[in-house]
Amino acid sequence: MNKELEIIYQNIANQSELGQSSNYDDHYNPKRLYPIPRAPKRQEINLDPNSTTFYGFDCWNHYEVSWLNSKGKPVVAMAVISYDCHSPCIIESKSLKLYFNSLNNTTFPDVETVVQTISKDLSHCIGSEVAVNVYPLSEIASQTIYAAFDGICLDKLDIECSVYHVMPDFLSTSSELVEEVLYSDLLKSNCLVTNQPDWGSVQIIYKGKKINHEGLLKYLISFRNHNEFHEQCIERIFADIMRFCQPESLTVYGRYTRRGGLDINPIRSTEPCVFDGQNIRLIRQ
C-alpha cells in the first residue's frame, strides 16, 4: 500500500470505531453509520472507479436484527442488505452493527417501517440505493445450507505453500480453451484496520484459456496475511485474474463467515448480473 493510501486508511481507523471500545445507543441512531470510499483501493489495483466494464453487488446478511413493536414486545428477524458495486462507498461493518444495535429498544409500528428506515439510512450513508429485506424467523426456517459452492474444489490439490502475501505471479494459463467453475474454502485475509482474521470461500467462474489450478490455489492462499476489507479482496482477485489470465468472461464470488452477526458476500463479474437467487448460505455461515 502506498503512503497516500496508508494515510487515508489511518484516518478511517481514527475516525471510525473499528478497533476501538464503543458505547451502545439506547435508541435509534443513524449517525453510527460510517462510509468508506471505494475509489482509493480501486485505483491501487488499476480498476477505474467510474468504469462500467465490471458489474456486481455486495450482499450482507444480518442474523441479529431486533426492535420493539407498538406494545413494547421485542421482535427478532434476519435482514438481507444488498447494493451495487458502483456505489461511491461501502459501509464500515462495525458501524453497521452499532446502527442495528440502536434499533433494539426502538419502537416501530410494523416491519415495513423498519425496512423503509434501514433502506433510507443505508442509502444515505453510501450515496446509492440499498435494497433491504427483513424476514421473520418463520420465513427462513427452511433455508437450505449448502456444504460448498458448486464447481471443482481446488483444495484437494496437494501443493506446497510458503507465500502468504498476495502474489499474482502464481496465475498462469495454458492454450486450452475451457469454461470452468472452481472454488476454494481456503480464502483468509485480515481486516485492514483491526488485523482480525476474515475467513471465506470463493467461487471463480470463467471462460477462456485454462487457468492453472495449482497456481490459482497458491494465489488464493497468498491472501492469508494480506490486510484488506472483504470487498477489496474480491475485487483484487477479479482484477488480477483479468490481468494475468485474460479470460473472455469472469465472475468472482466471495462468501465470508460472519462477525458481529453480519456476513459479507461480494460478487464481481464481467457480465451484468442480478443478485436474485445468488444469496446461498454456505455451511460456515
UniProtKB/Swiss-Prot annotation:
Name of the gene this protein is made from: queF
Subunit-structure text: Homodimer.
Active site: C191, D198
Main localization (coarse): cytoplasm
Physiological role: Catalyzes the NADPH-dependent reduction of 7-cyano-7-deazaguanine (preQ0) to 7-aminomethyl-7-deazaguanine (preQ1).
Top EC class for this record: oxidoreductase
Protein's name in the database: NADPH-dependent 7-cyano-7-deazaguanine reductase
Bilayer-spanning residue ranges: none
Protein's pathway: tRNA modification; tRNA-queuosine biosynthesis
Binding site for NADPH: S93, K94, R259, G260
InterPro entries linked to this entry: GTP-CH-I_C/QueF, NADPH_dep_7-cyano-7-deazaG_red, QueF, QueF_N, QueF_type2
Coiled-coil annotated spans: none
Binding annotation for substrate: I91, E92, S93, H230, E231
BP GO terms, sorted: queuosine biosynthetic process; tRNA modification
NCBIfam families: QueF (TIGR03138)
Cellular component, GO annotation: cytoplasm
Locations listed in the record: Cytoplasm
Catalytic activity, as annotated: 7-aminomethyl-7-carbaguanine + 2 NADP(+) = 7-cyano-7-deazaguanine + 2 NADPH + 3 H(+)
Keywords recorded for this protein, A-Z: Cytoplasm, NADP, Oxidoreductase, Queuosine biosynthesis
